Amino acid sequence: MKFVVDTHTHTIASGHAYSTVQEMAKEASANGIEMFAITDHGPAMKGAPYLYHFGNLRVIPEVLYGVRILKGVEANIIDYSGGLDMPEEYLRRLDFVLASFHDICIEPKTLEEHTEAVINVLKNPYVDAIAHPGNPQFPLDIEKVVRAAKENGKFIELNNHSFVTRKGSEENCKEFARECKKQGVRIVCGSDSHISFEVGRFDRVYKLLEEVDMPCELVMNTSVEKFDEYIKRKKERIRRK
């Protein structure tokens, strides 16, 4: 299984990442990545860009160094009804939207409250995937979350960075992978790179996918064409709203 798409990356705009879009694209090209999503943190994160940054992403070329660039965000879940820190008028302009919990944006509560919030987020028509759902600070009912992803046509992310920065994530990620395989839910894999040298790095995720024997057809990162088709359908759906 070869990955050619990276769905989770951060540029210097996130405030705690260290590379420009141009540097990220150049490194992606060198690493054999054909498409990546810029998913800088939403404005509730300390040091993250304001909304105008996301409104102006259109100035970034669609292709740099032969690599396709998706304009996106990692939106923060900011309440337990599933509210995000990005208003609809901005979300609807983006190609790819991740949503996630961060403890500096929302205080962890109970498994039931976390699960309800994520299920509500998955109902948001602009959200494409739940990022790093294996985070042990925010335990989830894995079966219910995966079922909600299936019902809403959304993705579950496996995050390569989680194995290092979110200690205790590995077993949760493995359970998410197993449940996605069981329910036939598609996954996206993100490097969560905060510097250009990590774009397209999936070593830990590769190992996990091998362990659970994940079918290739459930992994979106193997084909630019799969992503193009998904984004085309998403934009058509949003236009009809």
From Swiss-Prot:
Entry annotated with the keyword Ribonucleoprotein: no
Q: How is the cofactor bound?
A: Binds 3 Zn(2+) ions per subunit.
Chain sites annotated for binding Zn(2+) 2: 16, 41, 194
Amino-acid positions noted as binding Zn(2+) 3 in the UniProt annotation, renumbered to this chain: 74, 102, 132
> Could you tell me which SMART domains the record lists for this protein?
POLIIIAc (SM00481)
Which residues does the annotation say bind Zn(2+) 1?
8, 10, 74, 192
Q: Under the GO molecular function aspect, what terms does this record hold?
A: phosphatase activity; zinc ion binding
Instruction: Give a Gene Ontology cellular component term annotated to this protein.
Output: cytosol
Question: What cofactor(s) does the depicted protein rely on?
Answer: Zn(2+)
Q: What EC number(s) does the entry state?
A: 3.1.3.-
Q: Which InterPro entries match?
A: Phosphatase_YcdX_put, PHP_dom, PHP_phosphatase, Pol/His_phosphatase_N, Pol/histidinol_Pase-like
Tell me the superkingdom of the source.
Bacteria
Q: What keywords were assigned to this record?
A: Hydrolase, Metal-binding, Zinc
Q: Which family, according to UniProt?
A: Belongs to the PHP family.
In its UniProt entry, what is this protein called? Probable phosphatase Cthe_0111
